[in-house]
From Swiss-Prot:
One of its GO terms (molecular function) is calcium ion binding. Residues 1-27 are annotated as: Disordered. This is Nodulation protein O. Induction: By naringenin (flavonoid). The NodO protein may play a role in nodule development by direct interaction with the root hair cells or some other plant surface in a calcium-dependent manner. Its main location: secreted. Keywords: Calcium, Metal-binding, Nodulation, Plasmid, Repeat, Secreted. It holds the Pfam family HemolysinCabind. The keyword NADP does not apply. GO terms for cellular component: extracellular region. It comes from Rhizobium leguminosarum bv. viciae.
């Protein structure tokens, strides 16, 4: 069923079947119900409950909250990809897209971070947290995503170099592809250990000490190059609870310099980082 909201804000209730829902331009409350639904919230500060089923949700501009419930779901924190094939592709603007909250729930879900201060919770089962650009364009406010429940035994960080939507528009995806042979594989070189033991691996997890900044972490390792990823215990940044520290993911853009793009709240201690492996990092 095709359901369209008004541009004045609306309550939208989906059917038990497979729905296509377009929320409009104002603040919406959307309950999609059962079925495999496609939901485009549009502008405004929206509350979206996708319900059971394999759902695809685009939050749109504004600070939105998405509850996906059960099923294998695909959640976008902003309007990064079209609901209809005729929609124009997004170009990253010179401003944030809103600070969104995504709860994926049970199922093997894909959560796609935007360029706001997003909060992502994957829920049960193996989830993929997708990042498409490592630092905002000039003129934006630098924000990074918080991942609340990364499970090192089954979850993965996916770093997008070719555009998750498939059209390889590099304006929307600027990670460097370090996969084993073809996009979608695990990272090709990986290191987990003391900072002085790292020598140019494409993903480096530092487990012997923490750092107060991404630049300090980059300075502590040797032979880092643009596009490498550093994971370190953050001594400075507090998690969403305002009390505990966590792990930070940073993108190297030059020697001794890196940008933080994600914070993992539940990896509280350096000892938690020792369980990270190459299988926790993939490239598109």
């Amino acid at each position: 069923m095709n359901i369209k909201g008004s541009d004045n804000g609306s309550f939208i209730k989906g059917s038990p079947e497979n729905d296509i829902i377009d929320g409009g331009k104002k603040n919406d409350w959307i309950d999609a119900g059962n079925g495999d639904d496609r939901i485009k919230a549009g502008d405004g500060q929206d509350s979206i409950t996708a319900g059971p089923g394999h759902d695809i949700v685009w939050a749109g501009k504004g600070s939105d909250v998405i509850h996906a419930d059960g099923g294998d779901d695909l959640l976008y924190s902003d309007a990064s990809y079209p609901l209809y094939v005729t929609d124009p592709h997004r170009v990253i603007p010179h401003s944030g897209e809103g600070d969104d909250v995504l709860y994926a729930g049970p199922g093997s879900d894909i959560l796609v971070a935007g360029d706001g201060a997003d909060v992502l919770t994957g829920g049960d089962d193996g989830d993929a947290f997708v990042f498409r650009f490592h630092d905002p364009m000039v003129g934006t406010t630098h924000c990074y995503t918080s991942v609340m429940d990364f499970d090192t035994k089954q979850d993965r960080f996916v770093l997008d170099a070719a555009d998750f939507g498939g059209d390889r528009n590099l304006f929307d995806a600027n990670f460097i592809n370090h996969s084993k042979g073809f996009p979608g594989e695990f990272v090709d070189t990986f290191y987990n250990g003391a900072a002085e033991g790292a020598h140019g691996e494409h993903v480096v997890v530092i487990t012997d000490r923490g750092f107060a900044s991404a630049a300090a972490a980059a300075t502590a390792i040797d032979h880092e190059a643009r596009g490498d990823i550093i994971v370190f215990h953050d001594q400075k940044t507090l998690g969403q609870d305002g009390e505990t520290h966590g792990a930070t993911l940073a993108y190297v853009d030059s020697a001794n310099h890196a940008h933080a793009f994600a914070h993992v709240d539940n990896l509280h201690d350096m000892s938690d980082l020792t369980s990270l492996t190459a299988e926790n990092f993939g490239f598109i």
